[in-house]
Amino acid sequence: MLLLVPEINLTPQLEERVRSHFADESVVVLNSDLPDAQRARSWLAVHEGRARILVGTRMAALASFRQLALIVVDEEHDLSYKGGDGARYSARDLSVKRAQSLGIPVILGSATPSLESWSRARSGSYRLLTLSHKAVSKAEPPRLRLVDTRTLKKGEVLSEEVKEAIGATLQKHEQVLVYINRRGFSPVLMCPSCGWKSACPHCSAFMVFHKDTRSLVCHHCGYTQRVPARCPGCGAADILPVGIGTQRIEEEIGKLWPDARRLRIDRDNFKTKRSTDKAFQDVHEGKVDILIGTQMIAKGHDFKKVSLVVILNIDSQLISTDVRARERAFATMMQVSGRAGRAGLKSEVLVETAFPDDEIFTFLAHQDYQGFADQMLKIRKRDGAPPFVYQALLTSEQKELPQALELLRHAVETGLEIQSKLPDGGGVAIYDPVPMTIVKVANRNRAQLLIEGRTHRELLQFLRAWVQVIGPCSGGALTLEVDPQRY
């Protein structure tokens, strides 16, 4: 049996449950955080049949089994299953294909399934199984309260409503979870005198201010530098942080509740499996009063004592132009909300937003994933967006942007020639090359080209013919990704 989880920090909890339930079975773990020797032992154990249960992350989808009989993909909607570098396969889709070829069942589990999976379930391609009750029978859904950020005072980090709710929760000796998917202290430093901003010299992005190390860090290329003593633009002494991240929330909470035991969990301060496991164990054992974190704390964890969840900075996803942004925003809010009241405690979720009238919050208040998903599918169908079309993304990275765009224009010309020889253009549409949203990363300029097909078969047929022509001519400067999740 293969059990997949999207992130390494979800492994210990699932491993413990599997070992307790299948006490007589040998269970092994496979993920990128393990030493090479231990990964090899786990791989060989399932390959030789000495272990019959494998718990792992994306890489485990490729493990060799003597007689695989069942695949379970937990949190199947999670973006972590689709790699952004190297071999850009989806561990979820690979698992489905592997199960089909072996004639075995595959279970895709999620409280917020991807719209692709939900569409297949609605059409009958997948069998839909719904849990009729919660693991704790007396558990009630958390009450949703929206905090209109348009009423916040200038420079205010947390609203009065959030402060009052946190204070009341601490008085009850229950735990608070504060979610913000932004690391660092603030996403940018700015000079109010001349407008200078902490731009990365190697990327078309800003460097994030990390106050604990007094450094500016680019989260795209990793470039790091010390915070300048004065503005590099005009020499002014006052350089101010703009926006909030996990470190700023942690500092503000420390000022407001200095006696509260607080813990920040993100990739900056927990970089190893051992330290992360210890941190989550402290939360489970009640040694933490206020937990602050990013996606690392948003899903899968069974926090028994959390009765208040605070969600910050969700608006960036609500107004994004990414076709999947609202789907991911709703999934994030549902998943984070699900950390509250898991042991039957009366719970509440506070969301800070400038768009309290957005219909997405009505669905969230009723925990109505089905209603939200069905509405989104209607919109996607109307707009001709996935899962009603199938996409591929061709990207080019060059020293200069014109070179990257020119390489893609040549690929377009080649594609149009192939299309002209196919009935109805092969059922494929080729769009114009455009610069990527973040154009430059690590001194490489990036451009992309979107290809859409009416069916998966038509898209793949075209891509096979296309790659045979453009592949040898690209010199390795092109990357093709089928079913892209990031644009």
Language-model features, listed with the residues they occupy:
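Conserved short beta-strand edge segments in small beta-sheet-based binding/regulatory domains
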Residues: 421-429, 469-484
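Short amphipathic alpha-helices in soluble, non-transmembrane regions
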Residues: 407-413, 461-469
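Short, flexible active-site recognition loops that position polar ligands and cofactors
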Residues: 452
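Basic/aromatic recognition patch in beta-strand/loop cores that engages polyanionic ligands
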Residues: 442-445
